[in-house]
């Protein structure tokens, strides 16, 4: 069995972003039910030197849109990091999902050998399209989605594994 670059990337990222929206929705409902200021969750961290929830969402969405653009050879859209409410974070995630859905398989498939260079603080890092997807994008994306889940769970939001995995009959 083989899997295409498109199948291994955009549908996976869209599902992860959809699940992240669900997780944030549960946190928003929890805040309303318990009469907790939602900004408490938006600013929450697992540890003082770790990034807050809001930054986890910024990075997850930036990773997803950057993946689609780089694999397709397109310009990466810039999103200013200004969202500070659950509604604004939902809108950012939806904008990213809509962007990912604007690509079709033909734009992504065949990108396995595309040269991708990331400008990092430590200097440029070079990848092929396949190594970029498998060794950078997917681990980085899921690290930040998982950390968002962990921050909210640690903050008392009633979340379970199916909230993270997306137990809404999308496994086909």
Residue ranges of model-derived segments:
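A short, mixed-charge helix-start or loop-turn motif at secondary-structure junctions
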Residues: 2, 78-82, 130
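Aromatic-residue-lined binding/catalytic grooves and analogous aromatic/hydrophobic interfacial grooves
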Residues: 3-26, 39, 46-69, 94
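Long, well-ordered alpha-helical segments
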Residues: 20-34, 148, 152
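Acidic interhelical loop/turn segments
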Residues: 31-42, 102-133, 165
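Short, contiguous alpha-helical
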Residues: 42-76, 125-159
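Helix-adjacent hinge/juxtasegments
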Residues: 65-106
């Amino acid at each position: 069995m083989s899997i295409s670059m498109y199948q291994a990337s955009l549908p996976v990222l869209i599902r992860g972003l959809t699940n992240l929206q669900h997780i944030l929705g549960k946190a928003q409902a929890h805040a309303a039910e318990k009469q907790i200021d939602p900004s408490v969750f938006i600013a929450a961290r697992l540890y003082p030197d770790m990034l807050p929830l809001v930054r986890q969402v910024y990075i997850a969405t930036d990773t997803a849109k950057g993946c689609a653009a780089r694999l397709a050879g397109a310009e990466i859209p810039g999103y200013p990091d200004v969202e500070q409410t659950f509604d604004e974070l939902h809108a950012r995630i939806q904008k990213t999902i809509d962007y990912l859905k604007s690509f079709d398989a033909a734009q992504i498939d065949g990108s396995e050998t595309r040269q991708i260079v990331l400008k990092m603080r430590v200097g440029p890092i070079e990848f092929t399209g396949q190594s970029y997807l498998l060794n950078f994008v997917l681990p980085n994306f899921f690290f930040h989605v998982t950390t968002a889940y962990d921050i909210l769970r640690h903050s008392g939001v009633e979340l379970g594994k199916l909230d993270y995995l997306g137990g809404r009959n999308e496994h086909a």
